[in-house]
Regions:
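C-terminal hydrophobic helical "lid"/dimerization subdomain
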Residues: 1, 240-241, 271-275, 279, ...
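Glycine-rich beta-strand-centered segment in the early N-terminal region that forms part
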Residues: 23-37, 50-99, 104, 112-114, ...
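Mid-domain Rossmann-like dinucleotide-binding core that forms the NAD(H)/NADP(H) cofactor-binding site
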Residues: 143, 150-152, 156-244
Length: 375
């Protein structure tokens, strides 16, 4: 079928809305009419080259929600009409890693940046006669998708699509970073560096886990104000102010848990984050930096002598098939505020405006909302 999508053809160029050709679902694949797509900072890394796909052109988007329209042979637990969220981490349930309970590290994830379909190794999308590389095997910046069933999670049909799309990456990653990877305990003090979409979800996780003080650090004043509304007890504009402020509030003990959710992580800054981490504390690396940034600035002696932990995480250490419906159930019960995380909704043609707003610090999360006019 012919549809359209937001493509990039080379680094540091704007998104281009173009006609694309999309194949039908084959064995184990699902066709989805997209209703909403989250605008995550990771897709901007595609533009800058921080996350390079295996080739060009690239179809962006890895947060999305929609309605199943067709399924291929071998798909038994998903049917046309189902409302679904796309998980940027596939979860086969069969590989050794999934069997060990680490579905966020599914072996299918090895192909996230390769572009070829998991099902048969071919390319399902073409543009201008060339194969298209969809972001994390998804490509939610298009009103239609054909994806492997391992990336599809059924959800409660009463959840609004513009909210549901957030749990495909940002919310699940942030919330899980707090309650799973950081394992925040009641009464602990927590610092969250960067309070965009992922950071605001981590903040809500810290609140739910019973943190005593929650320190939110962000250079954008509006985001700091929003962080206070979401449950932060103290806010700071930069690491220098945070170092002094956290030391004063905790009498020099610092934060038991630090969660890094900045827009772009830099190895040179890691030591400043460890400096606000308490003795025996954990600094969780949730944010992603450039794949070319291989140098990390750490005082190894202090890391050892203070017994601090520097812990990486992907998808917040969660299980897509469990965590996505669970977080949406919490939303339905009024225990998770997702409505206020959607700052602005855009048309697909406004994608460059949306990313400009993100870079200017105007959004917690921007969302592309599809209409019949897009199809």
């Amino acid at each position: 079928m012919k549809t359209k999508g937001a493509l990039i053809w080379e680094f540091n160029q704007p998104w281009s809305i173009e006609e694309i050709d999309m194949g039908d679902p084959v064995k184990d694949e699902v066709k989805i009419q997209m209703e909403a797509a989250g605008m995550c900072h990771s897709d901007h890394h595609l533009v800058t080259g921080g996350i390079p796909m295996a080739g060009f052109p690239v179809l962006g988007g890895h947060e999305g929600a929609g309605i199943v329209t067709e399924v291929g042979p071998g798909v038994e637990d998903i049917a046309p009409g189902d409302h679904v969220v796309l998980s940027f981490i596939p979860s086969c349930g069969k590989c050794p890693t999934c069997q060990a309970g680490m579905r966020n590290l599914c072996d299918l994830g090895a192909g996230l940046l390769a572009g070829a379909a998991v099902s048969d190794g071919t390319f399902r999308i073409q543009a201008r006669g060339q194969n298209v590389y969809p972001m994390t095997l998804l490509g939610t910046f298009s009103p239609y998708m054909v994806v492997h069933k391992s990336s599809v999670v059924k959800i409660d049909p009463s959840v609004p699509f513009e909210v549901a799309c957030l749990v495909g990456c940002g919310v699940t990653t942030g919330y899980g970073s707090a309650v799973r990877t950081a394992d925040i305990r009641p009464g602990q003090d927590v610092a969250i560096v960067g309070v965009g979409g992922v950071g605001m979800a981590a903040l809500q996780g810290a609140v739910a886990a019973g943190a005593r003080y929650i320190f939110a650090i962000d250079p954008v004043e509006w985001k700091r104000d929003q962080a206070l509304k979401f449950g932060a007890t103290h806010v700071y504009p930069d690491m220098e102010a945070a170092l002094l402020g956290i030391a004063e509030v905790t009498y020099g003990l610092m934060a038991h848990k630090v969660i890094l959710t900045v827009g772009e992580l830099k190895g040179a800054d890691i030591d400043s984050y460890l400096n606000i981490t308490a003795k025996g504390g954990t600094c969780v690396v949730t944010a992603i930096g450039s794949l070319l940034d291989t140098q990390v600035n750490v005082n190894l002696a202090m890391l050892t002598l203070m017994q601090k932990n520097l812990q990486g995480t992907i998808f917040g250490g969660g299980n897509p098939q469990y965590d996505i419906p669970q977080l949406l159930a919490m939303y339905k019960a009024g225990k998770l505020n997702l409505d206020d995380m959607v700052t602005t909704q855009y048309k697909l043609e406004q994608i460059n405006d949306g990313y400009r707003d993100m870079l200017d610090g105007k959004n917690i999360r921007g969302v592309i909302r599809y209409t019949d006019a897009d199809r």
